[in-house]
């Protein structure tokens, strides 16, 4: 076949801006797309895996913030989005913590809505409260420190700090202890 081949990710967007008719054949490559999510212990995780882990939040780091486009959630410096031009940017949160599952610990990072869910605060409220970082940290600690949560995310090898880390794609902060006990005793 003749033509051009373009490789896209799940977040890619292809916009055709041509006058002539274009025949587009979209096919998914074998093995491409979402990786299988595996339930794992922290001691067993490896880079490039998508994992589901239950654990206790044992350390919480102060959140970071950046401005994002309200339409696409990408970073918007000085109220300018690379895709949407001038926008009224909204604060977005980056929230990190350490999760312990009894086998090891791992640093986990959540962005935007998932970060808000885990921290128990909206990015807007957290950013406003960040003017008093001690009170903000205390509130977040009270919301999540010591809680058992389930996360799903992709494992990354942080070579700078020589450790595995997880970028969270979803989180469940309302686990049922009876269900967890049944899962643990059935293994």
Regions found by a protein language model. Give the residues of each.
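Single-stranded nucleic acid-binding proteins centered on OB/S1-type folds
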Residues: 1-187
